[in-house]
Structures are given as C-alpha cells and as structure tokens.
Curated annotation (Swiss-Prot):
Residues that coordinate or bind hybrid [4Fe-2O-2S] cluster: 249, 273, 317, 405, 433, 459, 493, 495
Name of this chain's protein: Hydroxylamine reductase
Protein role: Catalyzes the reduction of hydroxylamine to form NH(3) and H(2)O.
Organism: Mannheimia succiniciproducens (strain KCTC 0769BP / MBEL55E)
Keyword Nucleus: no
Residue(s) carrying Cysteine persulfide: 405
InterPro entries: HCP/CODH (IPR004137), Hydroxylam_reduct (IPR010048), Prismane-like_a/b-sand (IPR016099), Prismane-like_sf (IPR011254), Prismane_a-bundle (IPR016100)
Cofactor annotation: [2Fe-2S] cluster; hybrid [4Fe-2O-2S] cluster
Keyword Iron in annotation: yes
Family: Belongs to the HCP family.
Pfam families: Prismane
UniProt remark on cofactor binding: Binds 1 [2Fe-2S] cluster. Binds 1 hybrid [4Fe-2O-2S] cluster.
NCBIfam families noted in UniProt: hybrid_clust (TIGR01703), PRK05290.1 (NF003658)
Length: 553
C-alpha cells in the first residue's frame, strides 16, 4: 500500500504516505492496492479511447464509465474491494470493445503506451490484489525525484477531482465529447509515468482549465434540473417525526428521495454538502425537506449514531459506519461503497423508507435555529451592482472567499477564527463543507442589506465565485487580481486539489491554502508554486489578514 492523496495521510520523519495494513481513512491495504490497479486499467482504457477517436469512434458508455470509476478511488468514497475489482474488470471490457472497433477500420492496431495491453491476472480479489502491487504509485519516485513525482501526483489527484465533477454532471444529463477527449488525453498521458517537471506543471494547469469547463457544465445541469438557487432560510434543529438523512453531492438522488417519501410522514434532512439543496426551487418546494442535520463529514460517526432514522450516502465522504453502530441503517448509492453496507443500484429508495419507518425518529421538535443558503451564480451576479456600490461608498472593503473541505485537524479552527475576526466592513463568500466551521455564527449585514456571510453552495460551486469575480472585474475595468477579493482555501482531498488548479489556470494569484501542505508536495515544490502563483500556506488569522490587506492597498 502506498497512498498519500489526502490530508490525513501518515506524515513521519521516515516518509509520507499510508503504507501499512490500513490507511488513516480506514481503507485497507488490499482496497488501496486494487485502486492502483483500477487506475492502471483506466489509463489503458483512455489510451484506446484516444486511438478510437482518430477514426471518429466513440463508445459513449466507455466514456461515461471512465471518470465514474476513477471517482471511486477518491478519498472516503469506496472501501469495497470487490466493487473496485469489478470496476477494473469492466474497464478492460470497455477497452477491448474499443480495440475491436478500431480493428475493424485499422487491422491489427497498436499504440505506443506501456499499459495499452494490460490484462488482469485472474478474477478473484485475492489474485488481483497480488497483481496490483506492481502498480503502486511510488514505483519510480526515487528515479524521477520527489519534485517531479509530487507534481505528477498533483496532476493525478487533480484529474480525480475533475472526474468526480464530470460524473456529477453526467447524472444530470450533461456530457461533452470534447471534454471527455481532453480527460482521456490527460489520463492516457499519466499512464506513461511522465517525469519532466516543466511538462507536469503545464499539464496541471491544463487539467485546471479543463475543469473550469466541467464546472460550467455541472452548474448548467443543476440549474436546468432544479432552478437557480435563491436565498433561503434553513432550520438546523430536529423536527419531531420519522426521518431520513441524505449526504453527499447528488441532488438528483435527493429529488428522487423527496418524490418517493412525499405523503409518507417522513421528514428529510440534508447533511454535509447537501445543504445547498435548500436554495434550489425544485427541491425546496417539498415541505418535508425540513432542514439540515449535523456538521462536517468528519463528525459523522457521532452524529449519524444519534440520528434516529435511515441515512443515504450519495457520494463522498463516507467513513466506517461500524464505529457508531449504524451500519444496518445506512445505504450507499452511485460509486460509494463499504463492505457489508446495503448498496442501492438504482433510484428505488424503498429499503431506505422501510428502514426509516422502523426507526424511532425524533421524539420532539427543538427550538428553531435558522441559517441562510442559496447565493448561487445568478443571485451573486445579480447582486454585483449592489456590491460595487458598497465598495465605492466605502462600506465594503474586501470579500473573503473561505471554503473547501473540512477535516478533523485542530488547526482547522483557523478558519473559524479568521471568519469571525474579519472587520464588519468585509463579507465572507463560502462554499464546500468547510463552511461548517462558521456557518451557524451570526455575521450580520452590511449597511442593513447585504449579508456578510454568503453561502454559494457545494465545492464545485467555486464556479459561482469565479463568475462573480469575473463580473466584478469586467464592470470595474480591472484585473481579477486587482479586485478587493481574496481566497483562503481549505483542502482535504482531491476535489479541493482540482479547485486550486482551476484557480491557478485562470490566473488567480495569492491564494492561501491550508491548514497544512499536501504530503505529496515537498518544500521545493511549494516554494516553486509560491514563486509562480503566489500560493501561500497559513500562519495565523491575524498575520494572514494583515498580508492580504497590505497587498490590496
């Protein structure tokens, strides 16, 4: 096992990365190794998808499968070795379909790729786990050096994040052949184990550029299906009655669940990154979508244990449900998996509803605590003139974008301290589950109108923040980096990595990121990123605030 993709990975004087029988996330060495094997088969699939495109051959199912299976290797998504092995087998089935299709127009085709003809050494998990060891991601680390190896992983993990967003968009009927061709290009290239540092840095930015198009596609899918988000009040306290909790990112699953539970006397609560659902007109119209429960994903073992109903995980982040003894009432969907947990293959939520009716539910209604969500792209852009007026009037001095992933490191209290310590003439635009560090605090308003805390949505809704910045830049006639706007990113896993690469690709400079640096990037690479892009780590809220304000004077 060698896994170094998330913040909680092992960091020791002897080296970084989880490399024992189990990772810090709870993933076994077997599952981790099988994920490496799956990635190798996906490299092969992408190599042949590119070859097929030379003959205008596209197998839609193969294109859709590739990023979906890659998504399964993200942190806290799928811990089920059997399903990971199944994805690897399916990858080669699609790969072979592509080879057959190419062979019909180009007899005996061949491509120059080290994984072009990879085959699996068996069908059992045990056989494949033995084979998987040769595809560990650190096999040539010493040969190419820590810097190049780290930036290669930056590309791989960034592409994982983009793959996740591609899958989120796909379930909302958004699919672009050109974007998938780009994805296959990057995935195939990574399978050649590139080692040139300059090329790797260029590709990292190119992956970020591709992801901007992916986020636009996802934004279109969400707004076309559910309407443009509007500001809405959300109760974060329990309501008496039977209940279901839904977590993850898949708003389509939530819509299906709401339709199937309507009139059954079951209250539905959002959790984690599902919170923004309360701002979408086609979701908030359901009266039994009563509120949001819990906080960041890292607290789920305690919070799910005391939630008296059924739970649905539609995407990341999942952690061991056996710790809180709720494995019998949690269900996984899509690419999520945990051994022994019931997996729903389609949108039939009957087992979830049945389990919810068996559970006790909340015995009484607690005193309401309301927070506001729904500041999506259209709402933010519509408010851009008002924002400019406040800036010109000297009533709004700076906008801080504080968002990204949450996690359990004590250092993450930095984000709470920073947000709450900001002057009253500043606003905080937040997104991702990092918002749970401060979204239940009262920030008040600016000039009696604009809320100081603006919840833009899920981590992929960085697109909304970017489009606001672009709009302000155009209306003020200044560059993006001249705006009184700063980004303080909270990273934990691969979606945050691709968000960062997207910002850098767009030319956004002086981003602050923390609470710690990724373990796969050494000090030399971090210094290089600081030199090229102004990327900085965190110090203290007071010191970083001072640096930010001084740069904008």
């Amino acid at each position: 096992m060698y896994c170094v993709q998330c913040e909680q990975t092992m960091v020791t004087p002897k080296g970084n990365g989880c490399s024992f029988s189990q990772g810090m996330c709870g993933k076994t060495a077997e599952t981790s190794d099988l994920q490496d094997l799956l990635i190798a088969t996906l490299h092969s699939l992408s190599a042949w998808a590119l070859k097929a495109r030379e003959h205008n051959i596209i197998i839609h199912e193969a294109d859709a499968f590739a990023p979906r299976a890659f998504f399964a290797t993200l942190t806290n998504v799928n811990f089920d070795s059997a399903r990971i092995a199944g994805y690897a087998q399916q990858a080669l089935i699609y790969r072979n379909q592509l080879i057959k299709a190419v062979n019909e127009v180009e007899p005996n085709p061949n491509i120059d790729h080290p994984l072009a003809n990879i085959e699996l050494n068996g069908i059992s998990v045990e056989q494949l786990a033995l084979q998987a060891k040769q595809f560990a991601l650190d096999t040539d680390r010493q040969q190419i050096g820590e810097e190049a190896h780290g930036v290669r992983l930056l590309c791989l993990y960034g592409l994982k994040g983009a793959a996740a967003y591609m899958e989120h968009a796909y379930v909302l009927d958004k699919f672009d052949n050109d974007i998938y061709a780009e994805y296959h290009g990057f995935m195939s290239w990574l399978g050649t184990q590139p080692g040139d540092l300059n090329e790797l840095l260029e590709k990292a930015l190119a992956i970020g550029s591709m992801n901007f198009k992916v986020m636009a596609m996802l934004d279109a899918g969400e707004t076309e299906h559910f309407g443009n988000p509007v500001p809405a009040m959300v109760n974060v306290r329990p309501v008496k009655g039977k209940c279901i909790l839904i977590s993850g990112h898949d708003l389509k699953d939530l819509k299906e669940l709401l339709e199937q539970t309507e009139g059954k006397g079951i209250n539905v609560y959002t959790h984690g990154e599902m919170l923004p659902a309360h701002g979408y007109p086609e979701l908030k119209k359901y009266k039994h979508l009563v509120g949001n429960f819990g906080s960041g994903w890292q607290n789920q073992q305690k919070e799910f244990a005391r939630f008296p109903g059924a739970i649905v995980m539609t995407s990341n982040c999942l952690i061991d449900p056996n710790v809180g003894d709720y494995a019998d009432r949690i269900f996984t969907r899509n690419i999520v998996g945990w051994p022994g947990v019931t997996h729903l293959e389609d949108h039939d939520f009957s087992p979830v509803i049945e389990k919810a009716l068996q559970c006790d539910g909340f015995p009484y209604t607690e005193l309401e605590h309301l927070i506001t969500v729904g500041f999506g792209r259209k709402t933010l852009i519509d408010a851009s003139d008002a924002v400019i007026d406040l800036v010109k009037a000297g009533k709004l001095s700076h906008v801080f974008v504080i968002g990204g992933c949450d996690g359990d490191k004590e250092e993450r209290h930095y984000y709470t301290d920073l947000a709450y310590a900001l002057p009253k003439d500043t606003a905080v635009l937040t997104l991702g589950c990092g918002k749970y560090r401060f979204n239940k605090l009262d920030f008040g308003t600016i000039d009696g109108g604009l809320p100081r805390l603006l919840d833009a949505g899920q981590c992929n809704d960085t697109y909304s923040a970017i489009m606001l910045a672009v709009t302000l830049s155009q209306k003020l006639g200044i560059g993006l980096n001249e705006l009184p706007l700063s980004i303080v990113l909270s990273w934990f896993e691969q979606k945050a990595i691709i968000v960062l690469l997207t910002l850098l690709a767009l030319g956004v400079k002086n981003v602050y990121s923390g609470p710690s640096k990724p373990a796969f990037l050494n000090d030399n690479v971090m210094a290089l990123l600081h030199e090229k892009f102004g990327l900085s780590g965190l110090t203290t809220p007071e010191q970083d605030f001072g640096h930010i304000i001084n740069k904008n004077l």
